[in-house]
Amino acid sequence: MDRGEEPMSARPALETESLRFLHVTVGSLLASYGWYILFSCVLLYIVIQKLSLRLRALRQRQLDQAEAVLEPDVVVKRQEALAAARLRMQEDLNAQVEKHKEKQRQLEEEKRRQKIEMWDSMQEGRSYKRNSGRPQEEDGPGPSTSSVIPKGKSDKKPLRGGGYNPLTGEGGGTCSWRPGRRGPSSGGUS
């Protein structure tokens, strides 16, 4: 029975030794390159996901093309829908062009009318520039526009009084400004 016990006890010792060796090897490998292994696994997972999505899309496209070849009615319906959409878009564009042309026509008519009014007012001797807020008076009881002398700026109050200019030192005040001298600030021989 001693012989029967020896192989049994020797075998677990070999297994524990190999497990210990495996544990030490894997532990040192993870300690040295653990983050690299983790990031490469995550990157590999992301790449596999992206490729699987693209493969699914490619398969779906191939199936759609195969169905389109098998069903010509679907192709005809798609082409008709596309033509109808193009026609609607063209009609919308044509309507926008017509609106724009009408607006341009109205603007040209307004400009032409203003030029005619300006020409007429110049022929009558009036100023052709009208104030938009006040219409001009026609032959009013007051004096004619050619004999009235404009008042100028006498009605307006000056923004600054007294003619004081701080840059020149003119006009009231006890302090006057003079520009500084050029050259070094301290006196010395050069």
Curated annotation (Swiss-Prot):
<dbReference type="GO" id="GO:0030970">
    <property type="term" value="P:retrograde protein transport, ER to cytosol"/>
</dbReference>
<dbReference type="Pfam" id="PF06936">
    <property type="entry name" value="Selenoprotein_S"/>
</dbReference>
<feature type="compositionally biased region" description="Basic and acidic residues">
    <location>
        <begin position="97"/>
        <end position="118"/>
    </location>
</feature>
<dbReference type="GO" id="GO:0036513">
    <property type="term" value="C:Derlin-1 retrotranslocation complex"/>
</dbReference>
<dbReference type="GO" id="GO:0034362">
    <property type="term" value="C:low-density lipoprotein particle"/>
</dbReference>
<dbReference type="GO" id="GO:0006983">
    <property type="term" value="P:ER overload response"/>
</dbReference>
<dbReference type="GO" id="GO:0019899">
    <property type="term" value="F:enzyme binding"/>
</dbReference>
<dbReference type="GO" id="GO:0032720">
    <property type="term" value="P:negative regulation of tumor necrosis factor production"/>
</dbReference>
<dbReference type="GO" id="GO:0030968">
    <property type="term" value="P:endoplasmic reticulum unfolded protein response"/>
</dbReference>
<dbReference type="GO" id="GO:0034599">
    <property type="term" value="P:cellular response to oxidative stress"/>
</dbReference>
<comment type="function">
    <text>Involved in the degradation process of misfolded endoplasmic reticulum (ER) luminal proteins. Participates in the transfer of misfolded proteins from the ER to the cytosol, where they are destroyed by the proteasome in a ubiquitin-dependent manner. Probably acts by serving as a linker between DERL1, which mediates the retrotranslocation of misfolded proteins into the cytosol, and the ATPase complex VCP, which mediates the translocation and ubiquitination.</text>
</comment>
<dbReference type="GO" id="GO:0016209">
    <property type="term" value="F:antioxidant activity"/>
</dbReference>
<dbReference type="GO" id="GO:0009749">
    <property type="term" value="P:response to glucose"/>
</dbReference>
<dbReference type="GO" id="GO:0036502">
    <property type="term" value="C:Derlin-1-VIMP complex"/>
</dbReference>
<feature type="region of interest" description="Disordered">
    <location>
        <begin position="96"/>
        <end position="190"/>
    </location>
</feature>
<protein>
    <recommendedName>
        <fullName>Selenoprotein S</fullName>
    </recommendedName>
</protein>
<keyword id="KW-0712">Selenocysteine</keyword>
<feature type="compositionally biased region" description="Gly residues">
    <location>
        <begin position="160"/>
        <end position="174"/>
    </location>
</feature>
<dbReference type="GO" id="GO:1990381">
    <property type="term" value="F:ubiquitin-specific protease binding"/>
</dbReference>
<dbReference type="GO" id="GO:0036503">
    <property type="term" value="P:ERAD pathway"/>
</dbReference>
<keyword id="KW-0472">Membrane</keyword>
<dbReference type="GO" id="GO:0071222">
    <property type="term" value="P:cellular response to lipopolysaccharide"/>
</dbReference>
<dbReference type="GO" id="GO:0005789">
    <property type="term" value="C:endoplasmic reticulum membrane"/>
</dbReference>
<dbReference type="GO" id="GO:0051117">
    <property type="term" value="F:ATPase binding"/>
</dbReference>
<feature type="region of interest" description="VCP/p97-interacting motif (VIM)">
    <location>
        <begin position="78"/>
        <end position="90"/>
    </location>
</feature>
<comment type="similarity">
    <text>Belongs to the selenoprotein S family.</text>
</comment>
<comment type="subunit">
    <text>Interacts with DERL1 and (via VIM motif) with VCP, suggesting that it forms a membrane complex with DERL1 that serves as a receptor for VCP. Also interacts with DERL2, DERL3 and SELENOK. The SELENOK-SELENOS complex interacts with VCP. Interacts with CCDC47.</text>
</comment>
<keyword id="KW-1133">Transmembrane helix</keyword>
<keyword id="KW-0256">Endoplasmic reticulum</keyword>
<dbReference type="GO" id="GO:1902236">
    <property type="term" value="P:negative regulation of endoplasmic reticulum stress-induced intrinsic apoptotic signaling pathway"/>
</dbReference>
<dbReference type="InterPro" id="IPR009703">
    <property type="entry name" value="Selenoprotein_S"/>
</dbReference>
<dbReference type="GO" id="GO:0005881">
    <property type="term" value="C:cytoplasmic microtubule"/>
</dbReference>
<dbReference type="GO" id="GO:0051775">
    <property type="term" value="P:response to redox state"/>
</dbReference>
<keyword id="KW-0832">Ubl conjugation</keyword>
<feature type="transmembrane region" description="Helical">
    <location>
        <begin position="28"/>
        <end position="48"/>
    </location>
</feature>
<dbReference type="GO" id="GO:0032715">
    <property type="term" value="P:negative regulation of interleukin-6 production"/>
</dbReference>
<keyword id="KW-0812">Transmembrane</keyword>
<dbReference type="GO" id="GO:0034361">
    <property type="term" value="C:very-low-density lipoprotein particle"/>
</dbReference>
<dbReference type="GO" id="GO:2000110">
    <property type="term" value="P:negative regulation of macrophage apoptotic process"/>
</dbReference>
<dbReference type="GO" id="GO:0080164">
    <property type="term" value="P:regulation of nitric oxide metabolic process"/>
</dbReference>
<keyword id="KW-0963">Cytoplasm</keyword>
<dbReference type="GO" id="GO:0045454">
    <property type="term" value="P:cell redox homeostasis"/>
</dbReference>
